Amino acid sequence: MKLAILGAGCYRTHAASGITNFSRACEVAEMVGKPEIAMTHSTITMGAELKELAGVDEVVVADPVFDNQFTVIDDFAYEDVIEAHKEDPEKIMPQIREKVNEVAKELPKPPEGAIHFTHPEDLGFEITTDDREAVADADFIMTWFPKGDMQPDIINKFIDDIKPGAIVTHACTIPTTKFYKIFEQKHGDLVTKPETLNVTSYHPGAVPEMKGQVYIAEGYASEDAIETLFELGQKARGNAYRLPAELLGPVCDMCSALTAITYAGILSYRDSVTQVLGAPASFAQMMAKESLEQITALMEKVGIDKMEENLDPGALLGTADSMNFGASAEILPTVFEILEKRKK
């Protein structure tokens, strides 16, 4: 299998967050006995996993930065990074972030410059600046592109070189639905049948070098292609999840924090209503729908920054406490503390 990676990534944004580390990359490095994998990041980590753990025999990375200032920081011994991550990553991550931030001050942003700690060629990858060259005869095309609005112009340069049946994936910078539209608008005949072009995601849900997981969107690829990618993801990333394309953003992107809170609330509320009160699931669903729709309507009407002015958080303290039993009781006490702090 040939894997084409379009976009090598840059570590500066990962360092800037102050919370990321190389836990997954170090784990893979130890698993396969190749220390140089320990400080890979972004698509380079995922490419190394696919090559070393899933048997992908050809990996080509395309990025214009290879003709510009592709910078490899070699201040840190891979073995030291691996050892630190066995105990506490924060024993070494502050020094790494400090060095990256220092280099980033003088280095232009992608595609003119990028920060790495391992050169892809040292992992047995081929490199090129030509996307068309990379995607030629590729079975799996993993894109790691800038924000969505820039992607049509990038994709249109190589779309005619994608072979029928190829799997094409996106990550965190565009929804699957919008990603698919780019291909549909240019080559409707290429995507009318899923088996002719399989558009989906290989979304890590976090920085790839930190967590071993991948999320694969269903709806725009054949079942065979999804299953192939799922099996690759399980071998390479350790944990793979299939989900409808429209749920990829709520589950994987920044709003996942809100999705987690909301989903836990729905499940707990459902169980309290159906298991303790004995009400039918249809009633619980009706009430849940009313809550979600009206709170969403309030946010859209007044704006997320003015919600408290229109609904005092304290108004819920004397009503929601009557549902503080069953599964809901596992969540509500903490919720009450938050509402109490925010009430007028």
Swiss-Prot record:
Keywords: Methanogenesis, One-carbon metabolism, Oxidoreductase. Optimum temperature is 60 degrees Celsius. The keyword Oxidoreductase applies. GO terms for molecular function: N5,N10-methenyltetrahydromethanopterin hydrogenase activity. Activity requires salt; 100 mM sodium or potassium salts of chloride, phosphate or sulfate are equally effective. Inactivated by O(2). InterPro entries: 6-PGluconate_DH-like_C_sf, HMD, HMD_C, HMD_C_sf, HMD_N, METHMP_Hmd, NAD(P)-bd_dom_sf. Optimum pH is 6.0-6.5 when making H(2) and 7.5 in the other direction. Pfam families: HMD, HMD_N. It catalyses: 5,10-methenyl-5,6,7,8-tetrahydromethanopterin + H2 = 5,10-methylenetetrahydromethanopterin + H(+). One of its GO terms (biological process) is one-carbon metabolic process. Pathway: One-carbon metabolism; methanogenesis from CO(2); 5,10-methylene-5,6,7,8-tetrahydromethanopterin from 5,10-methenyl-5,6,7,8-tetrahydromethanopterin (hydrogen route): step 1/1. Its EC number is 1.12.98.2. Homotetramer. Belongs to the HMD family. NCBIfam families: hmd_TIGR. Catalyzes the reversible reduction of methenyl-H(4)MPT(+) to methylene-H(4)MPT. This is 5,10-methenyltetrahydromethanopterin hydrogenase. It comes from Methanothermobacter marburgensis (strain ATCC BAA-927 / DSM 2133 / JCM 14651 / NBRC 100331 / OCM 82 / Marburg) (Methanobacterium thermoautotrophicum). The lineage of its organism: Archaea, Methanobacteriati, Methanobacteriota, Methanomada group, Methanobacteria.
